[in-house]
C-alpha cells in the first residue's frame, strides 16, 4: 500500500493500536525547557517514578531567560525559580542540560537541530507548540501539554490519534529576495490560520526543495500558524549535508546505514493525500502581516484590506476588530506603515542564514531615528558563528543591539517586551493581541524585511533596496 511520508513515520512508531482507543506511539526524542516542565517533574516525584529514557531527553533554558545578561540576577523572581528548578530536576533525573552558561544553550528548536538531536524518521515532542520546526528533517514533531510531558518522561510513549494528510506544493522557483518566511506567510494567507486543522502537512515542490535547512525549518515552524498538527519535509541530500558530523548524528558505519534508511523517507508516487494545496512560487512577493493573526497577511506592495469588501460577516467583524487594535486604516499602503521597534530572532528566524540575510540590509547603513532594533541569535553556536563572520559588528555599527541567545521578544515572558502602542517589525511567528507586550502591535516579516524596516523607519520592498 502506498504511503505518505507522515504515514511511514507514524506506522513505524505505533506500539499499540487497540480498537476504540488512541494508538500508543513511541517517542525518540523529548526536548524540555524551563516553562512547561516543572509540574511534569513534580508528577514523577509524587508517583515515585523514574525517567524512562534520560538519554533521549534534552533540556535547555530559553523562554524567560535574559538576552542582556547570563546572570541569574538578571531574571525576574518567577523566571529564576523556573530556571533553578530545571537545573535541580535535570541533575536529579540525569538529563543533559544546556543551561544559560553552556556554550550551546539556545532556543530549543534551534539548539536541537544544530546538535544533531533532530534526525529524519524520528518522533520528537516538546512542551512547546513550535516543535513542528523539526519536521524540516523528515521527523514527526509536535508540541504537547504538561500532562503529556509527564507521560513521555515516565513511559517514552504517548497516546495520539492519527491525523489527516495534506500536501502543500510550492511549484517553480521564487524570484530574488523571496525567503522561506515569505513562502510560509503566503501559504497561511492562502489557506488561513485554520486551513491545516486536523492535518499533518507535507511541504514539497521545487521551491521547498531549493530551500536550505534553515529555510525549511522556518516553513515547518509555522505549520502551527495554519492550524496543522505538524509540518514535514522529506529528507534529501541537503538534509544529510546539514547533519553530517554534528554531535548527536550517526557516525562512521552507522552514518551510512542512516543514509540508506533516510532514502526511504519520502511519499510514494501513488500515495493519496486527504487534501492538496498548490502555490506558484513566482507569484510570491515579500509578505507581512497587517492584523492580529498570521492569516491577516498581504504582499509589501498591497494595502490594508477594507472590511466592507468582505462578504462573510464573521470575517468582516474580525477585520474590523484587528484594524481597531493595530490602529491602521483600510486602504493604507503597507509601505506607509511606520515602525518604532524591530525584533530579529525567535525559533522561526534566528539561525545563521537569517542573520546573514538581515546583515545584508544593515551593512553600511543605520537604524532610523526613533527606532530601537535588537538582534537575538537563536543559540550560542549561532552567536559564535555570526561573530566569526563579523555579523555582530555590522549590526552594532548600524545601531542594532546584539544580544545573547533566547526566545526574547517573541513572547512577553522575559525582559524583552514592547510597550503599549509600540509597532514592531518582527521575525517571530505570532502577531496576536498582546503577544509581545500589552497593547503592542506586531507585524510578521522576514529577517531581510525587518532589517530594511529598521533602517527606513517603515516597511519597504527589499527587492528595491539592494
From Swiss-Prot:
Keywords for this protein: 4Fe-4S, Amino-acid biosynthesis, Branched-chain amino acid biosynthesis, Iron, Iron-sulfur, Leucine biosynthesis, Lyase, Metal-binding
Known function: Catalyzes the isomerization between 2-isopropylmalate and 3-isopropylmalate, via the formation of 2-isopropylmaleate.
Originating organism: Shewanella woodyi (strain ATCC 51908 / MS32)
GO biological process terms held by the UniProt record: L-leucine biosynthetic process
The reaction(s) this protein catalyses: (2R,3S)-3-isopropylmalate = (2S)-2-isopropylmalate
Ion transport listed as a keyword: no
Family designation: Belongs to the aconitase/IPM isomerase family. LeuC type 1 subfamily.
GN (gene name): leuC
Name used for this protein in its record: 3-isopropylmalate dehydratase large subunit
Entry's EC annotation: 4.2.1.33
Family annotation (Gene3D superfamilies): Aconitase, domain 3 (3.30.499.10)
Pathway: Amino-acid biosynthesis; L-leucine biosynthesis; L-leucine from 3-methyl-2-oxobutanoate: step 2/4
Amino acid at each position: 500500500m502506498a504511503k505518505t511520508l507522515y504515514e511511514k513515520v507514524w506506522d513505524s512508531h505505533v506500539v499499540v493500536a487497540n480498537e476504540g482507543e488512541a494508538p500508543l506511539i513511541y517517542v525518540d526524542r523529548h526536548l524540555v525547557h524551563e516553562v512547561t516542565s516543572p509540574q511534569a517533574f513534580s508528577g514523577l516525584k509524587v508517583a515515585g517514578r523514574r525517567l524512562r529514557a534520560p538519554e533521549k531527553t534534552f533540556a535547555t533554558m530559553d523562554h524567560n531567560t535574559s538576552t542582556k545578561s547570563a546572570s541569574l540576577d538578571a531574571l525576574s523572581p518567577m523566571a529564576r525559580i523556573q530556571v533553578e528548578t530545571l537545573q535541580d530536576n535535570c541533575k536529579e533525573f540525569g538529563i543533559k542540560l544546556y543551561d544559560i552558561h553552556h556554550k550551546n544553550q539556545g532556543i530549543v528548536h534551534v539548539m536541537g537541530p544544530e546538535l544533531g538531536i533532530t534526525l529524519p524518521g524520528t518522533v520528537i515532542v516538546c512542551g512547546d507548540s513550535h516543535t513542528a520546526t523539526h519536521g524540516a528533517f523528515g521527523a514527526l514533531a509536535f508540541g504537547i501539554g504538561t500532562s503529556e510531558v509527564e507521560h513521555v518522561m515516565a513511559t517514552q510513549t504517548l497516546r495520539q490519534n492519527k491525523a489527516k494528510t495534506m500536501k502543500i506544493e510550492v511549484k517553480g522557483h521564487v524570484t530574488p529576495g523571496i525567503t522561506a518566511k515569505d513562502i510560509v506567510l503566503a501559504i497561511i494567507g492562502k489557506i488561513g490560520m485554520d486551513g491545516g486543522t486536523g492535518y499533518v502537512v507535507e511541504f514539497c515542490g521545487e521551491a521547498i526543495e531549493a530551500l536550505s535547512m534553515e529555510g525549511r525549518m522556518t516553513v515547518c515552524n509555522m505549520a502551527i500558524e495554519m492550524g496543522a498538527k505538524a509540518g514535514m519535509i522529506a529528507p534529501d541530500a541537503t538534509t544529510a549535508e546539514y547533519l553530517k558530523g554534528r554531535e548527536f548524528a550517526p557516525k562512521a558505519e552507522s552514518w551510512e546505514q542512516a543514509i540508506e534508511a533516510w532514502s526511504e523517507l519520502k511519499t510514494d508516487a501513488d500515495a493519496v493525500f486527504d487534501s492538496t494545496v498548490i502555490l506558484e512560487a513566482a507569484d510570491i512577493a515579500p509578505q507581512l502581516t497587517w492584523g492580529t493573526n498570521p492569516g491577516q497577511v498581504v504582499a509589501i506592495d498591497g494595502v490594508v484590506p477594507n472590511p466592507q469588501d468582505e462578504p462573510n460577516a464573521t470575517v468582516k467583524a474580525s477585520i474590523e476588530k484587528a484594524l481597531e487594535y493595530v490602529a491602521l486604516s483600510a486602504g493604507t499602503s503597507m509601505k506607509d506603515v511606520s515602525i518604532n521597534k524591530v525584533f530579529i530572532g525567535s525559533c522561526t528566524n534566528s539561525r545563521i542564514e537569517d542573520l546573514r540575510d538581515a546583515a545584508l540590509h544593515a551593512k553600511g547603513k543605520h537604524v532610523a531615528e526613533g527606532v530601537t532594533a535588537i538582534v537575538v541569535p537563536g543559540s550560542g553556536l549561532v552567536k559564535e558563528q555570526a561573530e566569526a563572520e563579523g555579523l555582530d559588528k555590522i549590526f552594532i555599527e548600524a545601531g542594532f543591539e546584539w544580544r545573547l541567545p533566547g526566545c526574547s521578544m517573541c513572547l512577553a515572558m522575559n525582559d524583552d517586551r514592547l510597550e503599549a502602542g509600540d509597532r514592531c517589525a518582527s521575525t517571530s511567528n505570532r502577531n496576536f493581541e498582546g503577544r509581545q507586550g500589552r497593547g503592542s502591535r506586531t507585524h510578521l516579516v522576514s529577517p531581510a524585511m525587518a532589517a530594511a524596516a529598521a533602517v527606513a523607519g517603515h516597511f519597504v520592498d527589499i527587492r528595491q533596496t539592494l
